[in-house]
């Protein structure tokens, strides 16, 4: 059972801080005027890592809750961003670059799903 233990709060806070910081750095380094590469990168990397973490956590039920909370709820929650993706897509639509908006939305959704599957498959292959 998950509790409101101080360690759980700390784990989420530290993980979220690190994930949000990495997303900010990716945005600074990679986002351009025409295509938000930083946000896409954060979401694709986050998709892969959530697949990895889901598979690892499933294969290690003995791990304490704070590990999952730090990695998944904290770090990956801070790294990935559906709200920024949505705002960037709507901005593209408002600017009339419909093909770019559709490509970005498609790449973000399909790419994140594919990366999550790849993360799961990677761990399952390595644990054989």
UniProtKB/Swiss-Prot annotation:
| Record flagged with keyword Transport | yes
Q: Which InterPro entries match?
A: FluC
Protein activity control? Na(+) is not transported, but it plays an essential structural role and its presence is essential for fluoride channel function.
Q: Which reaction does it catalyse?
A: fluoride(in) = fluoride(out)
| Domain of life where this protein originates | Bacteria
Q: How does it sit in the membrane?
A: Multi-pass membrane protein
This entry's Gene Ontology molecular function terms read:
fluoride channel activity; metal ion binding
Which processes are annotated in GO (biological process)? cellular detoxification of fluoride
TM spans, by residue?
A: 2-22, 37-57, 65-85, 101-121
The UniProt keywords, alphabetically, are: Cell inner membrane, Cell membrane, Ion channel, Ion transport, Membrane, Metal-binding, Sodium, Transmembrane, Transmembrane helix, Transport
One Gene Ontology cellular component annotation held by this UniProt entry: plasma membrane
Q: What is its main location?
A: membrane
Question: Is the keyword Cell inner membrane in the record?
Answer: yes
Name the residues that bind Na(+). 77, 80
Where it sits in the cell: the answer is:
Cell inner membrane
A Pfam family cross-referenced in the UniProt record is CRCB
What this chain does, per the entry, is described as: Fluoride-specific ion channel. Important for reducing fluoride concentration in the cell, thus reducing its toxicity.
Q: What protein family does this chain belong to?
A: Belongs to the fluoride channel Fluc/FEX (TC 1.A.43) family.
Which PANTHER family does the entry link to? Answer: FLUORIDE EXPORT PROTEIN 1-RELATED (PTHR28259:SF1)
Q: What is this protein called?
A: Fluoride-specific ion channel FluC
Species, as recorded: Bordetella bronchiseptica (strain ATCC BAA-588 / NCTC 13252 / RB50)
**Which classification does the entry list for the species?**
Bacteria, Pseudomonadati, Pseudomonadota, Betaproteobacteria, Burkholderiales
């Amino acid at each position: 059972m998950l509790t409101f233990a101080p360690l759980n709060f700390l784990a989420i806070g530290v993980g979220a801080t690190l994930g949000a910081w990495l997303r900010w750095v990716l945005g600074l380094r990679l986002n351009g005027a025409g295509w938000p590469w930083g946000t896409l990168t954060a979401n694709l990397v986050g998709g892969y890592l959530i697949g990895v973490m889901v598979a690892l956590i499933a294969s290690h039920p003995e791990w304490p809750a704070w590990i999952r909370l730090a990695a998944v709820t904290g770090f990956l929650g801070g790294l990935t961003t559906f709200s920024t993706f949505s705002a960037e897509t709507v901005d593209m639509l408002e600017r009339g670059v419909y093909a770019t908006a559709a490509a970005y939305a498609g790449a973000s959704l399909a790419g994140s799903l594919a990366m999550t599957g790849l993360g799961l498959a990677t761990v399952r292959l390595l644990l054989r």
